[in-house]
Amino acid sequence: MQLVNTRYAEALIDVTEEKNSTDKVLNNLVQVLKLLEENREFYSFLLDPQIQKESRKEAIIKVFEGRIEQEVVNFLMLLVDKERFENIRGIVEEYFRLADERKNILNMTIISAFPLEDVQINRIKEKYKKLYNKTDVKAKLIIDKSLIGGVKIQIGDKVIDDSIKGRLLCLKEALLQR
């Protein structure tokens, strides 16, 4: 499923970069997801394979044409044509990731036992910005009291565990191996 999301997201970002409309399309995709979330009946209609593709595409045109970039309208219709509309959320998430990657932006999750102050978050962001040689860093903060203290940093599939819980687990493993 992830491969499908990546392929569609790459195709869309290639088109939007050519037309210099990546940021507009990012905003449009947020609007589309919001509308689909708020109007579950419309979303179900677009997913329903029992309804003719032409009817679903006409609905997309009526709702979106003139309100969002034409590339996004065409993209939504392509998803209907290929019966991939159920992948829209994953494709949009992958599009956002690719857009950030191409802008040299690092996305990270900071997992902490307690809320961090802005100064602490900025220090962490700056450290990883330099470490990964990125122009900017976007960070999401998650509170997980089970860490006891310290932080875990997640960047893509990589996790850097500098939490007390992580240190205790390492110590436990070391003691068990003796």
UniProtKB/Swiss-Prot annotation:
According to its UniProt record, where is this protein located?
Cell membrane
- One GO cellular component term: plasma membrane
- What keywords are assigned to this protein? ATP synthesis, Cell membrane, CF(1), Hydrogen ion transport, Ion transport, Membrane, Transport
Gene Ontology molecular function terms on file: proton-transporting ATP synthase activity, rotational mechanism
Membrane-protein topology: Peripheral membrane protein
Under Gene3D superfamilies, the record lists:
N-terminal domain of the delta subunit of the F1F0-ATP synthase (1.10.520.20)
What's the short name of a Pfam family annotated to this entry?
Answer: OSCP
Q: What does this protein do?
A: F(1)F(0) ATP synthase produces ATP from ADP in the presence of a proton or sodium gradient. F-type ATPases consist of two structural domains, F(1) containing the extramembraneous catalytic core and F(0) containing the membrane proton channel, linked together by a central stalk and a peripheral stalk. During catalysis, ATP synthesis in the catalytic domain of F(1) is coupled via a rotary mechanism of the central stalk subunits to proton translocation. This protein is part of the stalk that links CF(0) to CF(1). It either transmits conformational changes from CF(0) to CF(1) or is implicated in proton conduction.
What subunit structure does UniProt give?
A: F-type ATPases have 2 components, F(1) - the catalytic core - and F(0) - the membrane proton channel. F(1) has five subunits: alpha(3), beta(3), gamma(1), delta(1), epsilon(1). F(0) has three main subunits: a(1), b(2) and c(10-14). The alpha and beta chains form an alternating ring which encloses part of the gamma chain. F(1) is attached to F(0) by a central stalk formed by the gamma and epsilon chains, while a peripheral stalk is formed by the delta and b chains.
> What is stated as this protein's family in its record?
Belongs to the ATPase delta chain family.
Q: What is this protein called?
A: ATP synthase subunit delta
Organism of derivation: Acetivibrio thermocellus (strain ATCC 27405 / DSM 1237 / JCM 9322 / NBRC 103400 / NCIMB 10682 / NRRL B-4536 / VPI 7372)
